[in-house]
Design a protein with these regions (language model features):
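Active-site-proximal alpha-helix that buttresses catalytic centers in soluble enzyme cores
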Residues: 7, 13-82, 133
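Alpha-helix C-terminal capping segments
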Residues: 143-151, 189-190
């Protein structure tokens, strides 16, 4: 049986994204640009489904429990003319936890915890922020999530979970994925043919 295709969308921009602040588990709403990015992603997904001759309603839809991901999902579904609230929420898709660093910029992180910051620069995948979560642990929960998929799925989540999924599927290594930019307003398609980004 072929592996399910995943249409992966990172949530749209928030005020903290615009300010360079790390959100992690904090529930920051979309800003105006973020809402436009979500609608753009919905349009891209509609075009991909039309090109592939597939019905959007036949896909499974699942989002991170955080508001910025759920709002993005609802805007995507609105563009697709599907009932906006008819999707699943899965806690495994939540963003990497930044612990004490949530709400901070990189400069503030370095100033508050210089030794941990330096260690994380050397090994971002395995070193956790203070009271936070490592990418390795996010990779474990994303592997668990992926391994239970049985149908082609639209997932709306975060940059950190996208990087972890890329490592789970062998598209990137932990070294190459750790600092990879994940675009907002794009659709990342994971399939047996690898990964393609549409924006």
């Amino acid at each position: 049986m072929p592996a399910p295709t995943i249409y992966y969308i990172r949530h749209g921009e928030t005020a903290w994204n615009a300010e360079g602040r790390f959100q992690g588990s904090q529930d920051i709403p979309l800003n105006e640009l973020g809402r436009r990015q979500a609608a753009d992603a919905g349009g891209i997904l509609a075009d991909l489904c039309a090109h592939d001759g597939r019905s959007e309603s036949a896909l499974t839809f699942v989002a991170s429990p955080l508001e910025r991901a759920r709002s993005t999902m609802e805007l995507v579904r609105d563009v697709l003319k599907l009932p906006v609230g008819d999707y699943a929420v899965d806690d495994r898709l939540r963003e990497i936890g930044y612990g004490r660093w949530e709400g901070s910029t990189l400069a503030q992180m370095q100033a508050s915890d210089p030794e941990i910051f330096a260690a994380r620069l050397r090994d971002k995948w395995s070193v956790s922020p203070p009271d936070g979560e490592s990418y390795a642990s996010v990779q474990a929960r994303m592997s668990d999530w992926y391994n239970q998929l049985t149908t082609d799925t639209v997932a709306v989540a975060h940059g950190g979970t996208a990087r972890a999924l890329m490592v789970v599927l062998g598209v990137e290594t932990s070294d190459s994925a750790a600092d990879l930019a994940i675009e907002q307003g794009a659709v990342y398609v994971f399939s047996e043919g690898g990964l393609r980004k549409y924006s």
